[in-house]
Amino acid sequence: MDAIRVDGLVKTFEGFTAVDRISFTVEEGELFGLLGPNGAGKTTTINMLATLLRPTSGSAAVAGFDVTRDRDAVRKSIGVVFQEPALDGRLTGRENLEFHTMMYGIGKAERRRRIDEVLELVELTDKAATPVDKYSGGMKRRLEIARGLTHRPKVLFLDEPTLGLDAQTRRHIWEYVRKLNKEAGVTIILTTHYMEEADFLCDRVAIMDHGTFVALDTPVRLKDTLGGDVISLELEGDAAAFLEELGRLDWIKRSKRHEDVLSLTMEKGERRIPELVMLAQQKGVTVACVNLRKPSLEDVFLHFTGRTIREQEASPGERNRSMMMGHGRR
């Protein structure tokens, strides 16, 4: 059964199309990723599925409920962890969860049991009585995730759950997210602009750019569409003659240039490096750096869009609760 079904979903803001006719399904128990740069339409998509924004056109159902006609039923079926913090730093971790569960009308004894359960799940039991102001960034994100689970949602939306965290803390959050999905069986929709995050966590990934899907499949299959090895050459000098010569070589499957870095896909790349460097020198081009690796989701994004993903900082105050206040009740 599909936990989410989306058909031709569109969202426009004063003539600007943020989401442009996307269609997809997410199976129950799946961990589905929306991958793309900031401004690609990921958060707008999440906000429509979470009933915080009304679609301009198209349809979507979450947990079997239409996001336009059955908004209350959808909201009871989902949990949402926003990019922007939504915790009260003056309260303890447990008090934050108490306040949240009271809003769902859960009885006192059941509240206590569920809170204990989610605190243990995210390994914050020993910090439950500590004010959230004293939590690290990673602990706050774990508590945000715990809060999104206290009412036992069928679907959990995580909007950039590791944004702004260091690499080690991000990896810890990944482990908690995977645990929720595999052990608790929660269907998870994750937005991210971290390629390695989507690759590590997601069963399937939709790559978004300018409001549309440019690719959708498992991370393995997406990378397999490129095949072979990827050689990246950092070039110095006028490379026009070199690039023209490369175009005549039938063993180069595909090439993409981004600024001074040329990415070439081919079989048995390690054997071709000396030939490529020599050819560049013959054409008056200096190769400052050479890198050989297997294709990544970054290469997939570059292949479908012609550019690399941009790690821009999200502007504070946008999306999330401002959208909920400004658009959620329309």
Kindly label every feature range from the protein language model.
Residues E98, M102, A109-K127:
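Conserved ABC ATPase "signature" region
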Residues R152:
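Conserved catalytic motifs of ABC-family nucleotide-binding domains
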Residues L156-D159:
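Catalytic Walker B motif of ABC-type/P-loop ATPase nucleotide-binding domains
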Residues R171-A184:
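Helical segment within the ABC ATPase nucleotide-binding domain
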Residues G227, I231-R307:
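Short, charged/small-residue-rich alpha-helical element at the C-terminal edge
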